[in-house]
């Protein structure tokens, strides 16, 4: 949908008082970047990330092709396994890729920090259903904080799963990261109870068990 429609929408609660995951926040962040840099989001993505990360087959798509629609930032990335693993490598290595500094280490740390803080977290969020985790610091900036070090409060496993079967994750404690893609036909929640979204963490657990 156009940004003008988004900005006319009313907030449903005071910012910072409650956590509720949703792609609208990503749309607003994308528009903020456009205004600050005076460039369209796709141009920013290509110049700042895709090109230096050699993601030659990656771009963002709008919700539909009718015209007048902004890129869909929460789920609208068209990419490949090989392209996306370059991005994960950069995040895993604290902002560097092939010796090039893409993001500052401080930026990556802030992305993975607890952004929920004292906000109310309602039952049934992703980490609770998928991992049985009931901690409140479940989300950073565009990343789920799946597994937390109880002593430091730092997330040692982060992810950004998609409803249609994409599961990228990084586990810093086990020194492993990966990207699993599955083609899911129809709704992600099947009649037999399987959900490609909530079932994703079994992949990271299996990989960690193998590398150990």
Predicted regions and their residues:
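Active-site Gly/Thr loop motif
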Residues: 57-82, 113-179
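Generic structural signal for alpha-helix termini and adjacent loop/cap motifs
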Residues: 90-94, 114
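Residue-level signal for well-ordered alpha-helical scaffold segments within enzymatic catalytic domains
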Residues: 31, 35, 47, 86-90, ...
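Surface-exposed patches in mature extracellular/periplasmic domains of secreted proteins
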Residues: 98-103
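Catalytic-site signature segments of enzymes, centered on catalytic residues
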Residues: 4-81, 85
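Short, gly/Ser/Thr-rich active-site loops of penicillin-recognizing serine hydrolases
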Residues: 120-124, 148, 187-212
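C-terminal soluble interaction/assembly domains
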Residues: 180-187
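Acidic helix/loop microenvironments that form the catalytic cleft of cell-wall polysaccharide enzymes
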Residues: 50-54, 108, 112-116
